[in-house]
Amino acid sequence: MDKKLLMMALLITTGLATHAQEKLTRYQVRNAITVRTPIMNDSINPKGEKHTAKALLQTPVVLDLANAPTQMTAADTAGLVTFAKADKDNLLYLIKTQLRAERFMKGKLKVTSPVRWELFMNGESKMVKDASEDSISKAATKEVALRLEPEMDYEIAIKLLSTPDDKTVPSLKCELVKDDKFKEVACSTDPEQKHRFSLDNT
């Protein structure tokens, strides 16, 4: 009997943990943007510093994809989306999705990638990773705090930078982790979901 109770408790705990953490699986992706490193006399900035891959991540990109060439991309079973690696020129990918919680919710978005990236929420920069690793297995994971109001749309945009010097292909995994108190709050993560407008939008 004790063993049965223990097994049931483990199953319930596992179910709650699974419900509290989910992988994002669909993204809207803008076609890669070529970013060339300055050469010759332009190879240093006004401060006399050499241009670096970290600086390339600061290249301005229009986050609105309404008129941009895009495609829908699905993650694999591990939750990873993978893109073509830069060959001669650096490449910037813009990856977008949307979050909407049914009720007020707090949690975090865990982002894992072996290349450099910057994350925006509703157009505001929230996190920058300016170093690269040798493989996805060694990739650093960073967490972005979330505070979602009921039925509000939150646009997540990630700039992913691939350089010829990177040791691996650019890939990305995002996981939504709800705080314990909000495990049962439903939250959609669909890049194609229709926006909901409030009085502030009119």
What does each model-identified segment do?
Residues 83-92, 130-137:
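Extracellular beta-rich ligand/substrate-recognition surface
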Residues 10-19:
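Hydrophobic h-region of N-terminal signal peptides that target proteins for export
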Residues 101, 106-120, 156:
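Aromatic-lined ligand-binding clefts that engage carbohydrates, nucleic acids, or primary amines
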Residues 21-78, 98, 155-202:
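Accessory carbohydrate-binding/adhesion or oligomerization-edge regions at the termini
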Residues 121-171:
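Beta-strand-rich ligand-recognition modules
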Residues 87-99, 141-142:
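Short beta-strands within extracellular/lumenal beta-sheet-rich domains
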Residues 1-5:
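Positively charged n-region of N-terminal signal peptides that target proteins for export
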